[in-house]
């Protein structure tokens, strides 16, 4: 259900959206990224053979991101034709940055636990603190204190750095923001609209 793709090429690809118009008809932007760059560090959830790909920019302390996450979870439960690529874009301070690094540590080391941790961090939202994050990790049979300190010890994270560059290149100004196939959707997408976009 989960596979990896290459974040380090995505910036270049999305900066050259216009050149993709000459690609094969079935090679839309998001699926082009997935199909050609499978070896890397971006969390992806859903059917690996899905025709619809959503690339989601988010921050764990963003209230609308949490609301959108519930919609995406519902979409994934309803459809096997959608996969979601999660791009950590921590713009709401240090605890957001730490949460993003923790999520990527989980993806790298315990990928089967990623979706549960991701959803748990989303539920913590704006009120998340060190203690609540550690508790969430412990509840999922992980060493919360160790992982939290590991994240704090990262002076920078290449994946997150690239996500920031990508967001800037796309002209994004806040979270959430989504790339669905060839189109960019800034802001929260109502479930009724989202469900139609991913049909």
Where are these regions (language model features)?
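Extracytoplasmic thiol/disulfide redox context detector
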Residues: 2-8, 13-93, 149-174
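Cysteine-centric redox/oxidoreductase cores and disulfide-bonded domains
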Residues: 91-175, 179-199
